[in-house]
Curated annotation (Swiss-Prot):
InterPro entries: Arginosuc_syn_C, Arginosuc_syn_N, Arginosuc_synth, Arginosuc_synth_CS, Arginosuc_synth_type_1_subfam, AS_cat/multimer_dom_body, Rossmann-like_a/b/a_fold. Its EC number is 6.3.4.5. One of its GO terms (cellular component) is cytoplasm. HAMAP family: Arg_succ_synth_type1. It is found in: Cytoplasm. Pathway: Amino-acid biosynthesis; L-arginine biosynthesis; L-arginine from L-ornithine and carbamoyl phosphate: step 2/3. Signal peptide: none annotated. L-citrulline binds at residues 90, 125, 129, 178, 187, 263, 275. Its main location: cytoplasm. It comes from Legionella pneumophila (strain Paris). This is Argininosuccinate synthase.
Length: 405
């Protein structure tokens, strides 16, 4: 017997798609009650207006959940500690999806709903990220993905459906780009950006100044870290949200943190995206510099070898996985002594190191100096070299003439 769905929690953004999903869900699930869940991730939108729109569209309730601080502490700071970049470029702003799914599930369980729904399309990665997280957190909940089942195939059809159901559709030109925004980044896709042979127009950028319009004087910023986590900017301890907002403003005006990428989507296609993440770029640079000072060679190299694995699991939405828990445990150990201060200069899109120090620095000038010293006996190197190169020497002797094929 088919399960009767009487109440549905919907991850709601306020856009056209999720707005028409409210009446569509009520029609296709025997007038089920729909509860809208809106997450405040720092996207700088009028969330009260979005809540009212959800209610006007037919939702019985609409929750607005401020998750900015939780987003920074439980998601972004672990990402900074990991140093992970998807395909060595993408700053992973869609790390927000598991958090949205988590809040959707929490409210779903509180409201005792039968099912949850999301507005991700059948072509993108987000459907995987949302549904993986939901299944990991609450496998008993049914998941509804209208884009994979309904008959609406275009924006024009969606507008017609909205008007037929009394949903207000603003009379404005269609945005030239599809955007996603949170406190960590802004992404831009679609329009002219779909052609990788075309240069990115300056009008794409919202958070970052084009390099041609940046100040002609550098700006110095100083970041303090404690166990791999940023805790202060320019000597002032700030909340995670305030630190990100301030650093986004400072780095953004210097044209820092723009990535023009053709990425491999999880679902198989390649897509071009423009990503703005000024604060993220600076934090990653500062953290990487501090790690170079505080981690041993073998620890640093092992951590670097795992960064793509971590990036992949974040990109794929596998936040609530055993693999991620295991990697976090390793990373947390590596970060125990990543504490210190990093000075950087921001100038014309560049992040320039300007000094760093740490009470746990493994750099000792008396060992590294090129001047005369009484600490390092250079004769000791001979025995090490003999042992280190022994296998190469034996191979050459056996195969005569050093033929390495």
């Amino acid at each position: 017997m088919k399960k009767v769905i009487k109440k549905i929690a919907l991850a709601y953004s306020g856009g056209l798609d999720t707005s028409i999903m409210i009446p569509w869900l009520k029609e296709h699930y025997e007038h089920a009650e729909v509860i809208a869940v809106i997450c405040d991730l720092g996207q700088q939108e009028d969330l009260d207006a979005i809540k009212n729109k959800a209610l006007k569209s037919g939702a019985s309730k609409a929750y607005v959940v401020d998750v900015k601080n939780e987003f920074a502490i439980q998601y972004l700071w672990p990402l900074v500690k990991s140093g992970a970049l998807y395909e060595d470029q993408y700053i992973l702003g869609t790390i927000s999806r598991p958090l949205i799914a988590q809040k959707l599930v929490e409210i779903a369980l509180t409201e005792e709903v039968n099912a949850v729904a999301h507005g991700a399309t059948g072509k993108g990665n987000d459907q995987v990220r949302f549904e993986y997280s939901i299944k990991a957190l609450a496998p008993q909940l049914e998941i509804i993905a209208p884009w994979r089942t309904w008959d609406i195939k275009s924006r024009q059809e969606a507008i017609v459906y909205a008007k037929a159901h009394g949903i207000e559709v603003p009379v404005t030109p269609k945005a030239p780009y599809s955007r996603d925004h949170n406190i960590w980044y802004i992404s831009h896709e679609g329009g002219v950006l779909e052609d990788p042979s075309q240069e990115m127009p300056d009008d794409v950028l919202l958070m970052t100044a084009p390099v041609s319009q940046t100040p002609d004087e550098e700006e110095v910023v100083v970041l303090d870290f404690k166990k791999g986590v940023p805790v202060a900017l320019n000597g002032q301890e700030l909340s995670p949200v305030d630190l990100l907002n301030s650093l986004n403003q400072k780095a953004g005006q210097h044209g820092i943190g723009v990535a023009d990428i053709v990425e491999n989507r999880l679902v198989g296609m390649k897509i071009r995206g423009i990503y703005e993440a000024p604060a993220a770029a600076v934090l990653y640079k500062a953290h990487k510099l501090l790690e170079s000072l505080c981690l041993t060679r073998s620890t640093l190299h092992l951590k670097q070898s795992l960064q793509q694995t971590y990036a992949n699991l974040v990109y794929e939405g596998r936040w609530f996985s055993q693999t991620k828990q295991a990697l976090d445990a390793f990373i947390d150990v590596t970060q125990q002594h990543v504490t210190g201060c990093v000075k950087l200069k921001l100038f014309k899109g560049n992040i320039i190191p300007a000094g760093m120090h740490s009470p746990y620095s493994l750099h000792h000038p008396e060992l590294a100096t090129f001047e005369e010293d009484n600490v390092y006996n250079q004769k000791d190197a001979e025995g090490f070299i003999n042992l280190f190169s022994l296998s190469a020497k034996i191979y050459s002797q056996v195969h005569q003439g050093g033929n390495y094929d």
